[in-house]
Amino acid sequence: MPTINQLVRKGRQKPVYVNKVPALEACPQKRGVCTRVYTTTPRKPNSALRKVCKVRLTNGFEVISYIGGEGHNLQEHSVVLIRGGRVKDLPGVRYHTVRGSLDTAGVKDRKQARSKYGAKRPK
């Protein structure tokens, strides 16, 4: 615990805020074009082929975005909408593609949590 004299000399230091999604530039979502669609493997305890795409955003940033859900229709030059949200077991992936928006189709035959995957209500 500092003395009053130490506080007078130095003062308390504010914690430095680090932006977790710098490419969004304080916007909720951003549009971009896929430059590469590929699969990658997660970090140590997990094992899978995770679907990701490299996206060039309208503001010039180039980011890696995760494609959630089972199956997707994305390829190079697809126009996608990305939102913030990292994938814990994929290093460098800090964004998610929004399903059911622009060129990204919603997940087919999705019954639960449909709004997160752009699936329409089944008849």
Swiss-Prot record:
Basic residues bias locations: 113-123
Residues modified as 3-methylthioaspartic acid: 89
Region (Disordered): 104-123
Key words, A-Z: Methylation, Ribonucleoprotein, Ribosomal protein, RNA-binding, rRNA-binding, tRNA-binding
Listed PROSITE patterns: RIBOSOMAL_S12
Keyword rRNA-binding: yes
Molecular function per GO: rRNA binding; structural constituent of ribosome; tRNA binding
SUPFAM superfamilies linked: Nucleic acid-binding proteins
Gene3D superfamilies according to UniProt: Nucleic acid-binding proteins
UniProt xrefs under Pfam families: Ribosom_S12_S23
InterPro entries associated with the record: NA-bd_OB-fold (IPR012340), Ribosomal_uS12 (IPR006032), Ribosomal_uS12_bac (IPR005679)
Subunit structure: Part of the 30S ribosomal subunit. Contacts proteins S8 and S17. May interact with IF1 in the 30S initiation complex.
Listed name of the protein: Small ribosomal subunit protein uS12
Species of provenance: Neisseria gonorrhoeae (strain ATCC 700825 / FA 1090)
Taxonomic classification: Bacteria, Pseudomonadati, Pseudomonadota, Betaproteobacteria, Neisseriales
